[in-house]
Amino acid sequence: MPDNPSSFEDEFMKSNHLSVASESIPNESQRQSPTRLRVGTSKTDDIYRQKRQTKHIISQNEVFLQPKFFDNQNFDAQSYLNDVLQDLSEDEFVSLYNKLLRIHMGVRKNLEKNFYKNLNEYVFISGEVESMTSDFKKFQSLLKTLETDIEGLNLVDHTHDPSDESIKQTVQRLRSSIEGLDEAFWEAPQRQLICEQYNWMLINIDNQRPKLLVNMLLFNDRLLVTTSHMKEVDFPAKQQVLYNWNLTEISISSIETYGPAGAEMLQKEKEVSLYKLSINHNNKTTLLAVHNSEERDYMVRQARHHQLQELENWSRKHDEDLEFSRELEYHTKSEQADMCSYTSFQVLCKNLDTQDILQAYAKQRNMVKEISMQFDHLDIQISLQEFTDAIRNLALIQNKLERGNLNELFAEFFADKLHNRKRKVTEILLHQLGFKGISLSHGKEIVRYLRSLGHEKEGQGVFMKSRTLLIKEKCLNVQLEKDTPNFIDACAFIVFRCLAQTTSSYLQLFELKKLDPAYRNWIFQQIEALVDLIENQYKHLAHDRSYTDAVSKIMTYNTELKEAKIDAMPILQRLFDVHSKDLK
């Protein structure tokens, strides 16, 4: 191994160059590895000898065998070509140009050759595809013709046209002659008689012999096996139902066998052909047989056809019920936070998966969705406090519920939901009306909203309650800062001044020409509270001249209330009566 990394790289480069150049060396002596060291020579002499040999070999080969090393990923063709051309002589340059020209012409020739070859192949393949398409269309047409011919070969046809009047007579006859079926079976709206076949035999699985003559009645969703309706004495006149299968729950298949038909039943003692039918239901197999193969094949084909239809209908109905159940769950349980206390919500949640609710929802789905969407818009309007649109939307929903003729549970649920949303809007409006600093214009607007919702009386109560708290708050502030005589005077002034302002605002807000009894009673309550406050302040004090002056001054504050035709003197007279008793 070389003593240092640079000598190692030199040897590695020389070995790579020599391995490439050695392919062009014809004789065996030159094919020996140039890196082998001769015995008896020093390492330095061998290295110089290898360099001279490498230079000689490179000079004899093509110019592309120049010892150029580059990174494949970052290779720059222009710079590489410049490096190659800068050391070339004129002859070498001409030789390189001729070689490149030959390569170019060869590539062009190959491209043209491949183009015409591929074009011919494309034209050939296109023709084959067009021919195959034509053959396929002919094959499809032939299949349709064969299907029509095959159906025409089947001479057994026991179907009934549902529009034919005779089908009603046939069903009525079967209804009166078959025992073991309730009235609900015949009154099913979607049930239709497909075919009826007689002279079938119920086969004993153990000995493969017939044991009973039966009839086969195929409906679009059921398969009935009844006792044969014979007029002999040995057989009853009425048909008894032996099997009543749901088509979606059975597996039906035909069996080809030959064997004894049963002399007791057929009154024959010879070998006859029986065409058997196997029906599997709940891991239990039932065998039936008939002499006519066409009857059996027709029964199998019709049963499988309607079985497939029933399975498709069941799958579609199952998907619809699942979708309806999820939609109902969204419409109802999304309101759990607001509607959990309502009885209609609780009852509807318990019956979400019942068939009655799902069928009712299927009929009234569009209306329920439309009403739910209106409620969603209403919730957005309430959250944005767009009360004009919200109140209009409430009226629209109310009108739709009255005319919609919804299912009882849906109607009760939406009615309670509407009541809940009205309550929400009313609470927000009452809360805003109770603000102490509400403006007159805003207050009038809120009162109009409450009037349209039918809660104007509640608004009046909230207004009076908020003003009661305002008067108490102001009187409390006076009590903390004034002595007793001044306190009485200040409180009386505040109370009567607030009552006068409140009266004026009350008349304007609620658009009244005169005060209603409820408001008059509220004013009297405030004056009585003032009198109680004064009496409580002088409970342990002497009613001297200061008291008399304060009480007399209070009478002057009553002027504004007198102008509003409110007589508070009977209540204020209590203050003078107390003073008179003290003087006595």
From Swiss-Prot:
GO cellular component entries: cytoplasm; cytosol; exocyst; mating projection actin fusion focus; transport vesicle
Statement: the UniProt record of this protein carries the keyword Kinase: no
Subcellular location: Cytoplasmic vesicle, Secretory vesicle
Keyword Electron transport attributed: no
Segments of this protein annotated with the region Disordered: 19-45
GO annotation (BP), single: protein transport
Keywords from the UniProt entry: Cytoplasmic vesicle, Exocytosis, Protein transport, Transport
Comp. bias intervals (Polar residues): 19-35
Alphabetical list of Gene3D superfamilies matching this protein: Exo84p, C-terminal helical domain, Exo84p, N-terminal helical domain, Pleckstrin-homology domain (PH domain)/Phosphotyrosine-binding domain (PTB)
InterPro entries: Cullin_repeat-like_dom_sf, Exo84, Exo84_C, Exo84_C_1, Exo84_C_2, PH-like_dom_sf
Assembly behavior: Component of the exocyst complex.
Family: Belongs to the EXO84 family.
Functional description taken from the UniProt entry: Involved in the secretory pathway as part of the exocyst complex which tethers secretory vesicles to the sites of exocytosis. Plays a role in both the assembly of the exocyst and the polarization of this complex to specific sites of the plasma membrane for exocytosis. Also involved in assembly of the spliceosome.
Listed name of the protein: Exocyst complex component exo84
Gene this protein is translated from: exo84
